[in-house]
Amino acid sequence: MRFGVIGSGSWATALAKILTDNGQAINWWIRNASAIAHIRARHHNPQYLPSVNFTTELLNLSDSVRKVVAASDCLVMAVPSAYISATLGELEKNALAGKKVVSAIKGILPEQNLLLNEYLNREFDFAAEDYYTVMGPCHAEEVAAEKLSYLTFSGQDETNTREVASYFATDYLNTVINGDVYGVQYAAILKNIYALGAGIAHGLEYGDNFLSVLIANCADEMAGFLQKVGIRHIEVGTHQEEDPVSHKRSANYAASVYLGDLLVTCYSLYSRNRTFGNMIGKGYSVKTAQLELNMVAEGYNASKCIHLINKEIKAEMPIAGMIYRILWENVKAGPGFKQIEPYLV
């Protein structure tokens, strides 16, 4: 299978490392021509994960997304969700026909409130059975250091999903298979919002006791949203009860791709969403925090998208709702979190 990686940030670089560590040649779209020249000459990405050295014979680098798409059978999408439309906008309607797409995007398209598969279906008539996601608690920095990590691959067909996942399995990366394509994407979006909230709490100097209660309630709020949006009876986790009448298993969100990713994004110092939230809690304006971070915190745009979606589905979301108000409606972080406190259990 010919792989193409779309994106050149930390996560795209980590995924390129995983594939090439398995001896897989890749086509790699990188927007910046100077970064391409640097990788060819110095064997590493000058901006992201510079400790990762690549075997350049396995890299076909290009700043043309059309060329990378045309040369690939399976495309790994790893650009921030806000840039998807601009990145893929130059492609023809049939450019993705017969190809597989693996989404590594833990975000939602702003203004459109679409998951990547929904966008691809609308713009390219992309087939749902050819769409996969790769999610889970896996920071790019730890992949670069080859610390043992777990990634969950989701797709409609288990056999095909296992085949795609097999290209990513290494001695430092275990793969998990899951059929919940929509649920894992929404969970990844929500955990970025909640991690931003955890950062705000840290910036406001709440302690570990409060933070643990906040995150536990975030997990419950996430589960409620997933059920409201229609994600039901998914088979994840190891402790599941089967309804004796319907024989359907109850939803269990204690698997690594849901709860695990929430925990690591809320607690880890690698988390850009937590870092962004920490600055907001300390009194930074959104604009100043964005300039200081100099990377995309997906939770910022996601908070508005989820707010708009929740107007329709009406899930109980006091935590995500307040994070939205702090970021978008100029509610002060301190008084805002005081309003959250009574909801926590």
Model-derived segments and spans:
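NAD(P)+-binding Rossmann beta1-loop-alpha1 motif at the extreme N-terminus of oxidoreductases
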Residues: 1-52, 58-63
